[in-house]
Amino acid sequence: MSLKRHSLRRNACHLETRAGIPTILYSDATGQRGMDKNIGEQLNRAYEAFRQACMDRDSAVRELQQKQTENYEQRIREQQEQLSFQQNLIDRLKSQLLLVDSSRDNSYGYVPLLEDSDRRKNNLTLDEPHDKVKLGTLRDKQSKVRRQEVSSGKESAKGLNIPLHHERDNIEKTFWDLKEEFHRICLLAKAQKDHLSKLNIPDIATDTQCSVPIQCTDKTEKQEALFKPQAKDDINRGMSCVTAVTPRGLGRDEEDTSFESLSKFNVKFPPMDNDSIFLHSTPEAPSILAPATPETVCQDRFNMEVRDNPGNFVKTEETLFEIQGIDPITSAIQNLKTTDKTNPSNLRATCLPAGDHNVFYVNTFPLQDPPDAPFPSLDSPGKAVRGPQQPFWKPFLNQDTDLVVPSDSDSELLKPLVCEFCQELFPPSITSRGDFLRHLNTHFNGET
């Protein structure tokens, strides 16, 4: 009996769950219920209300957060638009200020600020060429967008016939962009011009050390004038009145560039006139022009006849002197004396006795030597050639005597000339000094 009571007590109190609301049932051994069912239902309804309130609260919080985020995003967008507008305005004002300053000061360090604004907008750095290409493409896209906006604004204005403020802003912005670009191009062109002017070396007429060749000293003033800077400029211009002196061994096609090409190499030129005594060893003697007389007029004609018929020279001379009644020996002595007293250097001058000058006289001294002579004649006119003085070979025993300078004594004039090669006599009465020299030249030419 006691065991039965104990089991009933243990099972009398248990927990029963109904729709999430715990219901406690009490029973005793007699079977009485501990709690009414109405209290359980009230508790269940209260719990349901509380749960619904919690759900409403969570949804309200979520809606509030969503509205706040949307509001924040809208405000952020508006602030960003305002910042971009202010930045564009600042860039435009700065560009205008720089344009004014550059026009006043002509400064070359101008950098357009449009690139800086684009860099700040797109977060680009111009450290690499790829970044520069990127920035250029972005600027092209922006310019295209601006053009499209301007065109669309124009179409809308045409449709509505109402001037829009937005169109004016776009036009002004495009205008200032073009102005900045043109200004940048002008500054870049000026900088390139200055750089090219520094690189380009002007052509300065450099006086190259050159001297006139020794064999071309007949007209030294004319030849030396070719090497002056003005003459060089005339030659380079292609003037036909001046002919350039070219080095030997060059063709006609290289005459224009031969003188300039020599300045590029290390060429040793002959010494200048002011650097060496070599070119001034012999003073230049002015040539004395004889007056035009009947004797000088017939001189060339007689020389041609003497060259053609040298054997008839003595006969012609004797015949002419016999016609006039003059002794040939006395006339020769008088001619030599008169020549020595008047002009010893001019040995070819014809000196005839006083008398009738209308008669045809013959010059007994030839004008010039034959062209086949290997050495210049000693009685040639005094043409000074600049160069080292070389002693002439003298075929006489006495080396101190010179044939060029005649002696004043009559004994030396009457002394016959003797050839040292063939021992042939040349008396002064029938032969002249030119005949003796021509005879010596035949020995050098190998004729005898």
Swiss-Prot record:
Segments of this protein annotated with the region Necessary for interaction with TRAF6: 105-224
Tissue: Heart, brain, spleen, lung, liver, skeletal muscle, kidney and testis.
Coiled coil: 60-98
Region Necessary for interaction with ZC3H12A: start-end pairs: 35-65
Cellular compartments annotated: Cytoplasm
UBZ1-type ZnF: 416-443
UniProt: Zn(2+) binding residues: 419, 422, 439, 443
Keyword set includes Cytoplasm: yes
Single GO biological process annotation from the record: cellular response to tumor necrosis factor
Keyword annotations: Coiled coil, Cytoplasm, DNA damage, Metal-binding, Phosphoprotein, Zinc, Zinc-finger
Phosphoserine modification, residue list: 211, 258, 261, 377, 380
Cellular component annotations (GO), alphabetically ordered: cytosol; protein-containing complex
Region of interest (TRAF family member interaction), ranges: 205-224
Location, primary (coarse class): cytoplasm
Organism superkingdom: Eukaryota
Span list, region Interaction with TBK1 and IKBKE: 166-205
GO molecular function: cysteine-type deubiquitinase activity; deubiquitinase activator activity; molecular adaptor activity; molecular function inhibitor activity; ubiquitin protein ligase binding; zinc ion binding
Listed Pfam families: TBD (PF12845)
Chain positions with Phosphothreonine modification: 246
Binding partners and assembly: Homodimer. Found in a deubiquitination complex with TANK, USP10 and ZC3H12A; this complex inhibits genotoxic stress- or interleukin-1-beta-mediated NF-kappaB activation by promoting IKBKG or TRAF6 deubiquitination. Interacts with IKBKG; this interaction increases in response to DNA damage. Interacts with TRAF6; this interaction increases in response to DNA damage and recruits USP10 to the ubiquitinated TRAF6. Interacts with USP10; this interaction increases in response to DNA damage. Interacts with TBK1 and IKBKE.
Function: Adapter protein involved in I-kappa-B-kinase (IKK) regulation which constitutively binds TBK1 and IKBKE playing a role in antiviral innate immunity. Acts as a regulator of TRAF function by maintaining them in a latent state. Blocks TRAF2 binding to LMP1 and inhibits LMP1-mediated NF-kappa-B activation. Negatively regulates NF-kappaB signaling and cell survival upon DNA damage.
Protein's name in the database: TRAF family member-associated NF-kappa-B activator
Gene: Tank
